[in-house]
């Protein structure tokens, strides 16, 4: 396997619409238990639940239509997103370390063979390694922000980039 293809529990669970739905349900349940007489949270939760369900459906449909099987990203921040939508995340760095020359060569060779068109990186990490790989395989490098305050917009944009031809 390629470097960084293993799941890492510490990665950004909130990048997955499915996980966001679970997080929202758990938060709502905790609030409801803490304030059992309050009904004002229910309407907000129901709106959020509906929005997240639509995001989940939209994400799944885009990925299914695209035929994409995996994507390359500098830091493995999309582990739960990949897991929940049947994708494989190939991370350039592993455990906070730059790849070895051998690992980098393997990523480049596989990306060339598969015709990878985009490599993703987060603005919290250096883009230099991503730029080198992208140039080498004639792909574009795309910035994503898994910490964006607009999680729904960020997930939509990320999905569009991952599934674009």
Descriptions of predicted regions:
Residues 5-165:
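Extracytoplasmic metal-acquisition and chelation regions
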């Amino acid at each position: 396997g390629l470097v960084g293809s293993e799941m890492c529990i510490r990665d950004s669970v909130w990048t997955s619409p499915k996980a966001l739905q679970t997080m929202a349900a758990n938060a709502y349940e905790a609030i409801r238990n803490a304030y059992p007489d309050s009904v004002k949270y229910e309407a907000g939760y129901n709106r959020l639940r509906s929005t997240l369900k639509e995001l989940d459906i939209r994400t799944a449909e885009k990925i299914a239509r695209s035929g994409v099987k995996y994507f390359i990203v500098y830091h493995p921040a999309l582990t739960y997103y990949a897991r929940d939508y049947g994708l494989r995340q190939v991370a350039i760095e592993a455990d906070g370390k730059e790849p070895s020359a051998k690992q980098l060569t393997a990523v480049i060779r596989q990306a060339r063979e598969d015709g990878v068109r985009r490599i993703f990186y987060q603005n919290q990490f250096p883009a230099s390694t991503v730029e080198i790989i992208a140039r080498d395989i004639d792909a574009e490098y795309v910035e994503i922000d898994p910490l964006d305050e607009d999680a729904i917009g960020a997930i939509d944009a990320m999905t569009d980039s991952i599934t674009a031809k």
